[in-house]
Amino acid sequence: MGDGKGADALDKFWKRVKKYGAKIEYVATDLSAAFISAVKKNAPQAKLVFDHFHVKKQIGDAVDKVRRSVYHDKLYEEKKDVIKGARWLLLKNSEDIKTESAKKQLEEALRVNEPLAKAYYLKEEITLVWAQPDKNAAREFLYGWISRAIRSENRHIIKAGKGMFKHREGILAWYDHKITTAMVEGINNKIKVMKREAYGFTDDRYFKLRLLALHDAGITPFL
C-alpha cells in the first residue's frame, strides 16, 4: 500500500519488484502521464495496456467540454435548456438510456446542435475499438476514428483524437492481453465506502490493518 495518488505512491512497490526480480510483462493502467512514466522507468520491458473505461472517459470528458462550449455560444442561446438538461444523457452509453422521454431529450439536444452531435457519435463509436475480431481490424477502426475526430473541426474532439493517436499502441495492446484496471477500481471503491462509513480515520496504522483485512471472510467495509 502506498500513500497518495501520485506515481511516488508506488515507490515501495517498485523497490519490491527489483528486490525479488519480478519480470512484469503487461501493466493495465489509466492514461495518467505520471504512472505511464513510472512503468517505463521501472519496468521498461512491460507492455502498457490502457484500460478501456479510462479511454472512454477521456472521450466523454471531451464531449462534455463541447457541450459546455456550445452552451455558452450565442448561436444556441434559445436552446440552452435543452443542451444543459442533456448532460448526463450525453455521457451515458446509448444502451443504458431506457426511457422514451430520455431518448427524446437526447435526440432533441443532438438535433439542435451539429458540433455536439458529431462529438456524441464519435464517443459512441470509440467503444467499437474493443469489439473487433482481431487486433488488425481494431487498428484499422481506431485509425479511422482518429481521422474522423481530427477532421471534426472542434478543438476538444481534435485534441481527444490526437490523444488517441498518441496512446494507440497501449489501446490496441488489449488484444494481446485482455487485462483491465476493473479489479483495482473495485478495491478503491470499497476503500471509499470504508472511509465514508467510518467518517474518516485518524489512525493511519489502524486504517492499513483494516485494508489488509478487507478481503477476509466476514469482514465488511464498515466498522
Predicted regions located by residue number:
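Glycine-rich phosphate-binding "P-loop"
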Residues: 1-8
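Acidic/histidine-rich catalytic cores and adjacent linkers
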Residues: 11-45, 53-57, 76-223
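Short alpha-helix plus adjacent loop in nuclease-associated cores
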Residues: 55-76
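General small-molecule cofactor/ligand-binding pocket signal
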Residues: 49
